[in-house]
Amino acid sequence: MTETEIFTSLNNTLMATGLFAITWAFLVWVAGRAVTIAVENNAGIITKIVTTIFGLSALWQFNFAFAYVPWSFATAAHSLAVLKSSGTDLTLNGESFLNAFPGEVSASAAPVFTIIPNDPFYTLFILSALYLVVGRLWIGNK
């Protein structure tokens, strides 16, 4: 794979991930609206359970879509490191990408996909969205 193909693949992955993220962000918003309506109308247990399942599913998929972003960057950095280790000279952009990449980039070990965010602010975002979608429904507005 050439450097151009690596960056093209990264950009295509980020565009597709963005489309999925927009879709799931909208569904998380729908879940939040459903929770607001359920709380305002003092909904029954069946409505609360269905709303909780929908909200958790939307939030899970939203988190899953955003887990691809750091993994995509790590995969591109790994591919560039493999390309560099094979003796191919990288452009200044490729070298800059590798040098600016946070963490260790290895040509021998591929990045591992994980849905657990390593950014504390993103973790706080997911936890606050979890409260807004599920916590308000079961705990209330106390």
Language model features: what each stretch is:
Residues 1-33:
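Cytosolic-side membrane-entry/anchor segment at the start of a transmembrane helix
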Residues 3-12, 103-118:
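Membrane-interface segments at the starts/ends of alpha-helical transmembrane spans
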Residues 18-25, 53, 57-60, 124-129:
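Residue-level signal for the membrane-embedded core of alpha-helical transmembrane segments
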Residues 26-36, 111-142:
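Transmembrane alpha-helical segments in integral membrane proteins
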Residues 38-59:
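Interfacial segments of alpha-helical transmembrane regions
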Residues 56-72:
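C-terminal TM-helix exit segments that contain a strictly Trp-centered aromatic cap at the helix terminus
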Residues 69-101:
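Juxtamembrane non-transmembrane "cap" segments at the membrane-aqueous interface
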